[in-house]
């Protein structure tokens, strides 16, 4: 009797039965829970498939439409109006999409059958955010070999490649549909999906039975016919908003593409919503010069930064009393004028018997290097020996101060087939670089002064010139150039540059130069062999010519120029500073002409070594 109270709890058989009952009950609950979860999973998967079937014909982006899943969850077969209104908020309020019936009013029917909304959906889920089931019928489109002349290329060329610019394809105001008659109203709205460019060029689409339209043929990866491409190119670009044009590869590239329109119309691809700045073609503004005396030659006072204008600087053949001369260095830039900031007056006062032979004007400003053709500046003194280069744009005079600034500004190219320029004097044109073999006519491009503005224009025919005087061969290893530097009579130069006194002088190989010849002397002067082109020491600078400052390496390197520039408020030379005229480089902001020349792919960029040279000199 004493053991009876504890017999129930101490009996191992009853204890094991309780454990078995508990385990059985737990297993039943687990099975019920698993069955419930399986049912929920199946129903959820089925619901997602239905939602995906219904939404892929309206949702063209790659992001899931959360608002549509929330709004239309209770019903599985909504009308076409309710599902189509979601396109306005497809990008979560970021992009406003116009309604489809704004452009195609004939395609909307209020009494559509629920089963009709899947018919003819030829692009089922090419943009869907979730991977489709592989059991779906996927096949190659049967129209891959067709080329129908009725392609609606307006919307095809307006197609986009990113979600942020999908809204622009619906802004085409001219939907040219050859099938827009009454027979098309029997088709529901899903057929118009290709009009908005919502297929990303996939080769495989989920095909459903139903009539095919000609817009659906735009999925063909083969190149379009060339006549269709060229006929629709300008029209599609004109109807496109400017804010969505971005340069890049074409949406439908092919070998026969009309490349003649590309510099003016840009490319057809719009890979985003960034503005296209490559199609901006504004006329160049009038040059605003600080010097009022530059009004006649004002267009040459537009100086730009280093390397911006690749073919604009080496044409000036100006001989002043300082002997500034520039020779042609590149045959490919024979029709371009200089962008040099010649906005200062290079007034040189010839004083042959005084120590300060040439007093520079206070408003002297060195021209800014606007061309890779003039990467550095070469001023060669009266001594014809080779010297190590001084820093760029440093005017270094000779040891004899009374000789004046007789220098030669020459531009030589390491890869130029004609490194030596043949300098002759002529009485015809002040600034002419004419290839004698091509008999070309040099004409200024539009941004420069017109021939009506110039007293003696640059347009000179070769037959109007006298036969050039041959130069004695100074360096026998250098071949003579086809480009001849024609320096003209003083009257034409002074009328062309009103602020510059051009005093022509014969240059002799002796170290001391004679007195300067007056300006009225018209006869030909014998070109001396002191005018010879030295080879460019910067041979590693690629195909761009570089000229550098060379002078005697003695202690009197800067004495002559320091004496000549003494007392000038704007120009100060220091014997210690390697680049004394840094503040005098008037580098003006880049103009639209410079932008156009920069965007030209035919122009080459600066060599990295040349760029590093200027960066080292704090230019």
Swiss-Prot record:
UniProt region (Disordered), positions on chain: 129-148, 375-478
PTM sites of type Phosphothreonine: 160
An individual GO BP term: lipid catabolic process
Phenotype for residue 273 to A: Reduces interaction with 14-3-3 proteins. Abolishes interaction with 14-3-3 proteins without affecting the interaction with PPP2R1A
Annotated segments matching region Required for interaction with PPP2CA and PPP2R1A: 380-401
Entry keywords, A to Z: Activator, Cytoplasm, Isopeptide bond, Nucleus, Phosphoprotein, Transcription, Transcription regulation, Ubl conjugation
Family: Belongs to the TORC family.
Protein name: CREB-regulated transcription coactivator 3
Protein's gene: Crtc3
